[in-house]
Regions:
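Conserved beta-strand hairpin/beta-sheet module of binuclear metal-dependent hydrolase folds
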Residues: 2-50
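Structural motif
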Residues: 32-34, 58, 129
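Short charge-dense sequence patches
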Residues: 1-4, 101-102, 126-130
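Active-site HxH/HxHxD metal-binding segment of metal-dependent hydrolases
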Residues: 41-125
Length: 130
């Protein structure tokens, strides 16, 4: 699909690389799907993802760097660890002008939980550096 390299790893699990060399994963559960990171390829990412699943797609960001969250504004539910939310609001390590342009949706904290049960088929483990 237009610059994306998609590998189906298992039923309901895809590894996706964009043409900029960024990797992401789409995991499909019973009622919804979860994308882990978004990459930075130009254009919209949701049309490509919707060709893989018809379920609503939430986004989990591994951390607040632009190459992981560029398309976050396309998602209604975006999750990020609370420490990265603080870094995001403080501008730590970010090019804020670019980040503010591409990321306008609200983010939800995974809280201090170490296991983030979003889908029925897996648990996403939330890890933050100390």
């Amino acid at each position: 699909m237009d610059g994306y390299e998609i590998e189906k790893i298992d039923e309901g699990l895809w590894a996706i690389d964009d043409k900029m060399g960024c990797s992401m994963y789409l995991v499909e559960g019973k009622n919804k799907a979860l994308l882990v990171d978004t990459g930075v390829q130009e254009g919209k990412i949701l049309p490509m993802l919707k060709s893989l699943t018809d379920k609503p797609i939430s986004l989990a960001l591994t951390h607040a760097h632009i190459d992981h969250m560029y398309h976050a504004d396309e998602f209604e539910e975006v999750y990020l660890h609370e420490r990265d939310i603080k870094a995001w609001h403080g501008g730590v390590g970010l090019c804020m002008s670019l980040a503010q342009l591409c990321f306008t949706s609200s983010i939800r904290s995974t809280g201090s939980r170490s296991i983030f049960p979003l889908l029925t088929r897996l648990s996403l483990i939330s890890v933050a550096s100390r």
